[in-house]
Structure formats: structure tokens, C-alpha cells
């Protein structure tokens, strides 16, 4: 599994 990392496992808004 992978933790929520912006651009890796999920998308994050700036």
C-alpha cells in the first residue's frame, strides 16, 4: 500500500 502523497498515490490541490 502507499500513503497519500501528492502526485504519487493521490491528487492534492495547492
Curated annotation (Swiss-Prot):
Q: Which residues carry this modification: N4-methylasparagine?
A: 3
Instruction: Spell out which residues are annotated as carrying Cyclo[(prolylserin)-O-yl] cysteinate.
Output: 12
Q: Where is this cross-link: Thiazole-4-carboxylic acid (Ser-Cys)?
A: 1-2, 11-12
The record describes its post-translational modification as: Maturation of thiazole and oxazole containing antibiotics involves the enzymatic condensation of a Cys, Ser or Thr with the alpha-carbonyl of the preceding amino acid to form a thioether or ether bond, then dehydration to form a double bond with the alpha-amino nitrogen. Thiazoline or oxazoline rings are dehydrogenated to form thiazole or oxazole rings. Maturation of pyridinyl containing antibiotics involves the cross-linking of a Ser and a Cys-Ser pair usually separated by 7 or 8 residues along the peptide chain. The Ser residues are dehydrated to didehydroalanines, then bonded between their beta carbons. The alpha carbonyl of the Cys condenses with the alpha carbon of the first Ser to form a pyridinyl ring. The ring may be multiply dehydrogenated to form a pyridine ring with loss of the amino nitrogen of the first Ser.
Cross-link Pyridine-2,5-dicarboxylic acid (Ser-Ser) (with C-10) mapped to chain: 1-11
Q: Where in the cell is it found?
A: Secreted
Q: Where is this cross-link: Oxazoline-4-carboxylic acid (Cys-Ser)?
A: 12-13
Q: Which sites are covalently linked via Thiazole-4-carboxylic acid (Val-Cys)? A: 5-6, 8-9
Q: Where is this cross-link: Thiazole-4-carboxylic acid (Cys-Cys)?
A: 9-10
For the modification Proline amide, which residues carry it? 14
| Keyword vocabulary terms for this entry | Amidation, Antibiotic, Antimicrobial, Bacteriocin, DNA replication inhibitor, Methylation, Secreted, Thioether bond
Biological process according to GO = defense response to bacterium; killing of cells of another organism; negative regulation of DNA replication
Similarity comment text for this entry: Belongs to the thiocillin family.
> Any idea what this protein is called?
Amythiamicin A/B
Protein source organism: Amycolatopsis sp. (strain MI481-42F4 / FERM P-12739)
Amino acid at each position: 500500500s502507499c500513503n497519500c502523497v501528492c502526485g504519487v498515490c493521490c491528487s492534492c490541490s495547492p
